[in-house]
Structures are given as C-alpha cells and as structure tokens.
UniProtKB/Swiss-Prot annotation:
Protein name: Thiamine thiazole synthase
Source species of the chain: Fervidobacterium nodosum (strain ATCC 35602 / DSM 5306 / Rt17-B1)
Gene name linked to the record: thi4
Binding site for glycine: R240
Name of the top EC class for this enzyme: transferase
GO molecular function annotations of the record: iron ion binding; pentosyltransferase activity
Family named by the database record: Belongs to the THI4 family.
EC number: 2.4.2.59
Amino acid sequence: MSMKDLKISQLIVKHYFQKLNDVLNVDVAIAGCGPSALALATELAKNGRKVAIFEAKNEPGGGIWGGGMMFNELVLESELEWYLKEHHIKYKKEDEFIVVDAVHFASAMLYNATKNGAYIFNNVFVEDLVMYNERISGVVINWMPTIKEKLHVDPITVVAKFTVDGTGHPANLVRLLSKRGIINSVKGSSENLCSCGVVEYEFPMDAENGEKFVVENTKEIYPGLYVMGMAAVSVGGGPRMGPIFGGMIMSGLRAAELIEEELKRIETSEDKMWVRV
C-alpha cells in the first residue's frame, strides 16, 4: 500500500496548523489583502514584525488583478518608480505615469510580502473585532464558506497589538464599530464621520484628489484600529480613483510608518497591555 496520499494530507494539516498557531498572537492583523495591505505587510515584516493578513476570497490581491474594466494593466504615478525598482517589479513609463501589468504586479506584491515573512490566509473572513479596555486588540475569524452558508459555527480569536481595516470599499471593520455606536465614544475619533454616527461612503470618481485623500486619511480611527486604502476613503467620504494604484501603495506605506512608530513606543513603554497613555 502506498503511503504517499496519507503523507500529503499529513504535511498539509501539519504545516497549516503550525502556521495558524503562529499567528494567534501577532503584532499586526490586517483584514483584506489588497495593495495597501500588501505594501503595509511587506514593510513591517521586513522590520521583523509578525503580520497576518486575512482575506475572505480565494484569490488575495484585491482589485489589482482586473486592472481597469478587465484590461489587466494598471497605472501608478511616476513618484512610485523607486518602489517598483526596490521590489523588482517591471514597468513602462508614459509621461508622468507608470504602467504595470496587473497580473505581474499582484504576483510581485504577494511574493514580496510572503518572502519577507508576512502570513496570508485566504478564504478566512474577519467577522468581528476583539476589544479590551476600550481598545481594539485583534480580530475574530471564521472560514468564508461558513459565513456564506450561514452555518452556526463559532469563530476563533487572533490577538494583535494593532488591527488594520484593509477591506476596501465596504470598510467592514469600522462599520462593525459604527453600527454599535462604539466609534463615537470618548476615545474614538469622529472627525471624519457623519454627525449621526454613520460612516460616510466614498464620493464619485476624481483620481487626482482621491490619490491625495487616501494617504491623508490613513490613520488610527479608534484606539488600536487603523484604516487604509479604500476603507480610508469610504470612512472619510473621499472620492474614488479607479485603476490608479499609487495612492493605495502610499497608504499602505503610511500605515506601516504609523504602526511601526507605535510598536517602538510600546517596546520602550512600561505599558504592557497595549493601552494608550
């Protein structure tokens, strides 16, 4: 009797379990695996941070793959040429813009994130948040098929020093707080929310201003919870920008910068419970 089939199953179960067990306590948990998440994860993982991305779909990469209207090319501003060179991504220059093959770009982003040590879990949905002492401290996860089929199966918890909403247009994590009235508590930031406590929706297309807006609105929206990418646009009520991805990359890099600063602050602080002082 051949043991090859058994060994294949054993190896998959063993190594997936090891991987999942390793991320139950992380520095950063990210919901959604779009370009901002990949840029953020790559930077923090390079710094030795433990980063886990949870993507509900089977194919991580967010909106990169389809380019513009399924023309699988995408555009970045020429200011991002350094980033493409640093990550060995092929591109073509056209005036003040850069054109990149969408499939190549998505593949390269995924490769660089995982090569540097970030974990990516596809088919895993972030259904809720962990909160300790009025601070977001991780995510609650379940299999996406469980959610789609509405099966009565309890989720499990991943504890994180910082959590990031990278769910794109829906801004799922922020809305989890908004619908409970938590986002407007005394410790929450409400400057870019409606007075009624409902999160704004993104405005119509305006690529130039949308690219600026997404970076400016990448921030900590509630203690322990950051927004970036299209989630930051939706939360702030900014304009969408379509198949230009410079703002997405810069948003992820901005989030990485902000979170790295906070992680260093925690390391030098006597505050061991990750609660802001």
